[in-house]
């Protein structure tokens, strides 16, 4: 199967998981990116079962609304039973690198209030050690260079994310993103806490403190379900 076919496979598997495990009338947390889009497309077929969704980005909001799925502000919702999102990398403990699509901060916020984080990914995203995929850090623009120096001191190579015309990429929150190459992140939880403590960092695209509870992994043999231990 192609990568796109695997994404559609896990998108449908996530919709099936929601149908089987989330009661009718609930609100679903939805991530951002091409794999999350496949979940949205599959969820649209059963949208009448649910009140709607909480979105993690402007792009996801637009896609949900295009399917007629009501979008709630997170401040309107007391709790979420499930959050479904993709990953750029996921390790054996359920820690992830996320943020390739630029929505890492809102993704982390929505994931933090969900009872269950369901990661959907193709098998290429499963790695023994995080870091081959550049680690995104969302930063307040005035702190960009200072954060870059801190990254360099740790052995990373900071690269400012830019648009096609060479201008800095601006997140939905009005900030910039540094993508860090050359890392091997043996302690994702510790590294997440370290980077998040730097002044000027909005958040780092490590999802270790709040990692995945479950991964639906698309493989040539179908969908593999991986459950991660709590904590």
Swiss-Prot record:
Membrane-spanning parts: none
Enzyme Commission designation: 5.3.1.6
Keyword Isomerase: yes
CDD domains according to UniProt: RPI_A
GO-annotated biological processes: D-ribose metabolic process; pentose-phosphate shunt, non-oxidative branch
Annotated positions binding substrate: 32-35, 85-88, 98-101, 125
Keywords: Isomerase
Single GO MF annotation: ribose-5-phosphate isomerase activity
InterPro entries, A to Z: NagB/RpiA_transferase-like, Ribose5P_isomerase_typA_subgr, Ribose5P_isomerase_type_A
Enzyme class (EC, first level): isomerase
GO terms for cellular component: cytosol
Pfam families given in the database record: Rib_5-P_isom_A
Signal among keywords: no
Gene3D superfamilies in UniProt: 3.30.70.260, 3.40.50.1360
Pathway in which this enzyme or protein is active: Carbohydrate degradation; pentose phosphate pathway; D-ribose 5-phosphate from D-ribulose 5-phosphate (non-oxidative stage): step 1/1
Catalyzed chemical reaction(s): aldehydo-D-ribose 5-phosphate = D-ribulose 5-phosphate
Active site per UniProt: 107
SUPFAM superfamilies reported for this sequence: D-ribose-5-phosphate isomerase (RpiA), lid domain, NagB/RpiA/CoA transferase-like
PANTHER family listed in its UniProt record: RIBOSE-5-PHOSPHATE ISOMERASE
Subunit structure: Homodimer.
Function as written in the Swiss-Prot or TrEMBL entry: Catalyzes the reversible conversion of ribose-5-phosphate to ribulose 5-phosphate.
Family to which this protein belongs: Belongs to the ribose 5-phosphate isomerase family.
Name under which the protein is recorded: Ribose-5-phosphate isomerase A
Phylogenetic classification of the source organism: Bacteria, Pseudomonadati, Pseudomonadota, Betaproteobacteria, Burkholderiales
